[in-house]
Curated annotation (Swiss-Prot):
Disulfide bonds: none
Record-level GO cellular component terms: plasma membrane-derived thylakoid membrane
Primary localization class, coarse: membrane
Membrane topology: Peripheral membrane protein
Assigned protein family: Belongs to the plastocyanin family.
SUPFAM superfamilies, per the entry: Cupredoxins
Positions with a binding annotation for Cu cation: H67, C112, H115, M120
Keywords noted in UniProt: Copper, Electron transport, Membrane, Metal-binding, Signal, Thylakoid, Transport
Function in brief: Participates in electron transfer between P700 and the cytochrome b6-f complex in photosystem I.
PANTHER family in the record: PLASTOCYANIN MAJOR ISOFORM, CHLOROPLASTIC-RELATED (PTHR34192:SF10)
Name this protein carries in UniProt: Plastocyanin
C-alpha cells in the first residue's frame, strides 16, 4: 500500500513539475548593415551576412548618401517577392534606417540603386 502511494505521489509531483519546465524558443535577432563604410567607401558593411530565419536586418545610412537596398526576383528564394522586401525609397540623413525581416531560408543578393555601378552590392544568407 505504501509503495503504491509513493508511486502515485511521485507521478503527481512529476505532472505538476512539468508545468514549470518550458522550452524557450530561440529569440530572433536584429543585425545592422551600414550603408557606406566608416572609411567613406561606397559599400555595405558588412557586405556578406549570415542570419537565421526570422531575424531582422536594419540598414542604417552611414556615409555618402543617398542609399537604398533593392532585391531582384532572380536573386532571392523563389517563394519571396523581391518587391516586398526591397526598400526603393532613398535615405539621405545620417542614421536614417529601415528594416527587413527574413523568414525564408536562402540567399538574397541586394544592391544600392545609385551606387550599384560602383559595386555597392551585398548578400544575406538565411539559414
Amino acid at each position: 500500500m505504501l509503495k503504491k502511494l509513493g508511486v502515485l505521489l511521485s507521478a503527481i509531483v512529476l505532472v505538476i513539475a512539468s508545468f514549470f519546465v518550458t522550452v524557450t524558443p530561440a529569440l530572433a535577432e536584429t543585425y545592422t548593415v551600414k550603408m557606406g563604410s566608416d572609411q567613406g567607401l561606397l559599400k555595405f558593411d558588412p557586405p556578406q551576412l549570415t542570419i537565421k530565419a526570422g531575424d531582422t536586418v536594419k540598414w542604417v545610412n552611414n556615409k555618402l548618401a543617398p542609399h537604398n537596398a533593392v532585391f531582384d526576383n532572380s536573386k532571392v528564394p523563389d517563394s519571396v517577392s523581391a518587391t516586398k522586401i526591397s526598400h526603393k525609397a532613398l535615405v539621405f540623413s545620417p542614421g536614417e534606417s529601415f528594416t527587413t525581416t527574413f523568414d525564408e531560408p536562402g540567399t538574397y543578393t541586394y544592391y544600392c540603386e545609385p551606387h550599384r555601378g560602383a559595386g555597392m552590392v551585398g548578400t544575406i544568407t538565411v539559414e
